[in-house]
């Protein structure tokens, strides 16, 4: 990802490209929290500290220089809560907030057909999606593949299809029940996510909102 980011910045003509290691901060946080975490196995908590450190670092630069942080979340991730609150959800604006992951790939491929040379590195498009919080991590270890996930999300969110209707349309029942549950449970994260471009008829935060607590179900 570091090399892909550097190449993308070069292709976009970004001169002030910076790499700021988070390892010292991560080590300091682990040391600070060690007494409180004593006797507990390492888990997602320690992984998410990395994302939150990146978010804190970006917001510090924003604060110091008056820049706005662009959030990288897309609608698929935002829908199911596949994001770290106060980590990769930080930012003042989210360009891809209302764009499903499969459409993001389509946009990348389209963008690379415009102009004299491709802008987005092929590695960004070709490599398996990953939060990169642990070695060999892939999104499809936690979620259905995006070509399976997105049609379920579109049916549930854009077309208000019920669980029985989604299953009747040929989607796997376990996937449907799991995905719709994730969507409902992630409302509290979406309420705290940055504003962004509205692309669909059911943009989160404006056109589609659920209660934060899920006792209504």
Model-derived regions: residue spans:
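ATP/NTP-dependent adenylation/nucleotidyl-transfer catalytic domains that generate, transfer
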Residues: 1-217
């Amino acid at each position: 990802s570091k090399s892909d980011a550097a190449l993308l910045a070069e292709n976009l003509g970004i001169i002030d490209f910076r790499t700021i290691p988070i390892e010292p901060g991560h080590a300091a946080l682990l040391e600070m929290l060690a007494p409180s975490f004593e006797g507990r196995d390492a888990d997602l908590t320690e992984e998410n500290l990395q994302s939150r450190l990146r978010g804190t670092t970006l917001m510090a630069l924003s604060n110091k220089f008056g820049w706005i942080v662009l959030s990288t979340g897309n609608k698929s991730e935002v829908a199911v809560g596949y994001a770290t609150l106060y980590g990769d959800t930080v930012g003042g604006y989210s360009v891809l907030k209302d764009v499903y992951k499969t459409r993001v790939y389509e946009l990348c491929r389209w963008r690379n057909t415009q102009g004299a040379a491709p802008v987005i590195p092929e590695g960004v498009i070709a490599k398996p999606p990953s939060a990169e919080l642990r070695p060999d991590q892939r999104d499809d270890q936690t979620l259905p593949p995006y070509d399976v996930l997105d049609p379920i999300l579109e049916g549930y969110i854009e077309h208000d299809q019920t669980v029985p209707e989604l299953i009747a349309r040929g989607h796997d029942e376990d996937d449907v029940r799991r995905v719709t549950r994730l969507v409902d449970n992630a409302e509290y994260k979406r309420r705290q996510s940055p504003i962004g471009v509205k692309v669909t008829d059911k943009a989160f935060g404006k056109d589609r909102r659920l209660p934060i607590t899920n006792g209504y179900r």
